């Protein structure tokens, strides 16, 4: 029998049994353009940064599964699609129409779920008298105090992405699935021993948990440049971190302004008396919990606004005829 006859026979057999010999192609999402024969599928990416696409070997693709040929013969959701006879591309509903609707849903979700903290940002500027300026992807807060001291606070306006190792995560998941009953029993015994140790060393464990929570919190770095009145050569720069809960950390300082190459003093290696007093001095110049909240809210608001504006721009593009 010829190849054409065998293929035709297989098609008739599978169609009569309400099954399909068509295989699934990894990477096609939501069934958009199901007949375009795309050989591109996305790979894992972190945060909102775009990652390069991965080309799929066409020899491994025999077709695209659709809901028209599901094995149970039932169609839960079906939308009539029309295709251009010449290009074989979907024309109704068009991909642009579907994408426009998806963009609008994303815009609505961002505006509904995430709070608008612009009022808190404006309130801080009015109360503490800082002047806000922008230089590229950095924001600057400037103020001259009554004693003539000039303070400049600088921080990045782009939120730093949290790096994720997807390959390592997949490997860990596979290892967990491969664990046998003996290993699970051993883990249970270890957990029982740990519980006993936790009861005996409750205070020490609480301290470790607190330190772990501080390390997991997403902090925003910022710098403070202090210029004494009439002494430009006596500039000092402090390195700090602002947390989402209002806490902040002063990690070090050095003589000089922004960008100067100087070995900083690690405040963590100084005495508690020094650390307490340096915090009190900086509080006199507006370095406090309100500033920490301001930096976090400002970066967070910019991130949400950037997302919304990007979706709106894409929606406007696909909405044009």
Curated annotation (Swiss-Prot):
InterPro entries: MAM33, MAM33_sf. This is Putative uncharacterized protein DDB_G0288137. Residues 167-212 form a coiled coil. It comes from Dictyostelium discoideum (Social amoeba). GO terms for cellular component: mitochondrial matrix. PANTHER family: COMPLEMENT COMPONENT 1 (PTHR10826), COMPLEMENT COMPONENT 1 Q SUBCOMPONENT-BINDING PROTEIN, MITOCHONDRIAL (PTHR10826:SF1). Keywords: Coiled coil. One of its GO terms (biological process) is cytosolic ribosome assembly. Residues 157-220 are annotated as: Disordered. Residues 161-214 have a biased composition (Acidic residues). Pfam families: MAM33 (PF02330). It comes from the Eukaryota. The keyword Ribosomal protein does not apply.
């Amino acid at each position: 029998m010829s190849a054409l006859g065998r293929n035709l026979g297989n098609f008739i057999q599978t169609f009569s049994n309400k099954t399909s010999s068509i295989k699934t192609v990894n990477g096609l999402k939501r069934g958009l353009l199901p007949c375009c024969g795309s050989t591109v599928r996305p790979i894992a990416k972190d945060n909102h940064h775009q990652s390069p696409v991965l080309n799929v070997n066409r020899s491994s693709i025999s077709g695209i599964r659709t809901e028209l040929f599901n094995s149970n013969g039932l169609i839960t959701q079906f939308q009539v699609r029309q295709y251009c006879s010449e290009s074989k591309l979907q024309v109704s509903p068009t991909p642009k129409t579907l994408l426009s609707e998806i963009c609008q849903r994303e815009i609505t979700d961002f505006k509904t779920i995430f709070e608008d903290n612009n009022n808190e940002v404006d309130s801080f500027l009015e109360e503490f008298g800082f002047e806000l300026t922008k230089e590229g992807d950095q924001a600057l807060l400037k103020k001259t105090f009554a004693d003539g001291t000039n303070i400049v606070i600088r921080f990045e306006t782009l939120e730093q992405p949290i790096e994720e190792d997807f390959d390592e995560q997949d490997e860990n998941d596979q290892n967990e699935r491969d664990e046998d009953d003996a290993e699970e029993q051993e883990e249970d015994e270890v957990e029982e021993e740990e519980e006993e140790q936790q009861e005996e060393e409750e205070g020490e464990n609480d301290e470790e948990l607190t330190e772990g929570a501080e390390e997991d919190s997403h902090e925003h770095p910022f710098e403070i440049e202090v210029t004494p009145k009439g002494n430009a050569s006596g500039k000092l720069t402090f390195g700090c971190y602002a947390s989402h809960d209002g806490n902040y950390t002063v990690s070090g300082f050095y003589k000089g302004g922004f960008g100067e190459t100087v070995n900083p003093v690690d405040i963590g290696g100084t005495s508690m008396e020094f650390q307490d007093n340096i915090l009190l001095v900086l509080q006199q110049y507006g370095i406090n919990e309100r500033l920490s909240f301001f930096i976090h809210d400002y970066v967070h608001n910019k991130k949400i606004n950037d997302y919304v504006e990007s979706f709106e721009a894409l929606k406007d593009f696909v909405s044009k005829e």
